Design a protein with these regions (language model features):
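Bacterial N-terminal signal peptides that target proteins for export
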Residues: 1-9
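Bacterial N-terminal signal peptides
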Residues: 8-18
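Ser/Thr-glycine-rich phosphate-binding loops at phosphate-binding pockets of nucleotides
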Residues: 128
Length: 187
């Protein structure tokens, strides 16, 4: 009996460490109608996805999403969101040249949201991945390594050509980013 208890405790500890070692993992969300293939929940009220279609905007609104942050440089969500009450935000980014100011603006929008929000770019992988990695680090105190691992290996379709995003995370002074995000003035 005692051996069984000790074995159970040992296995429980090992399992806990293995889960902890896996780091962070976003929760896959499937909307009715399957409108989005790359939709994940990263925190309470914070989601990430690829570019939503008009039908996806309606499905997101029905799901309870009230705000959308578009990271695309040359595409607004005006047409896709037409006929919904979803509040649109936009921080124009190019995946090959994301800068700290853009990241801070995006993080402030997420911080100041009034309803659940979806963050997206075209595929929901690179620009969205960088913003979500910074979100994890700044707001959830996730390590840079775990945030990078989730961005690159989390099943979101990260494109290795954008290794600059990994460098951006590794080289970021997170305390300075955090201070700027929490400040009221523009970066």
């Amino acid at each position: 009996m005692r051996k069984q208890i000790l074995l159970s405790l040992f296995l429980g500890i090992i399992f806990s460490f293995s889960v902890f070692a896996q780091g962070v993992k976003a929760e896959k969300i499937i909307l009715p109608g399957g409108e989005l293939n790359n939709l994940y929940k990263i925190d309470s009220g914070v989601y990430r996805s690829e570019q939503p279609s008009h039908a996806a905007f309606k499905a997101l609104e029905e799901y309870g999403i009230g705000e959308v942050l578009n990271l695309r440089n040359r595409h607004s969500d005006d047409d896709e969101a037409a006929g919904t009450n979803v509040k649109l935000h936009r921080v124009k980014m190019k995946a090959h040249s994301v800068n700290e100011e853009q990241l801070i603006r995006a993080l402030r929008i997420i911080k100041n949201r009034k309803t659940p929000i979806v963050i997206h770019c075209h595929h929901g992988s690179d620009r969205t991945g960088a913003v979500c990695a910074f979100y994890r680090i700044v707001y959830q105190n996730v390590s840079k390594e775990d945030a990078i691992r989730e961005m690159t290996e989390g099943g979101f379709g990260f494109h290795r050509i954008y290794r600059n995003l990994i460098r951006k995370i590794k080289e970021a002074d997170i305390e300075q980013v955090r201070k700027k995000v929490m400040a009221d003035e523009e970066p």
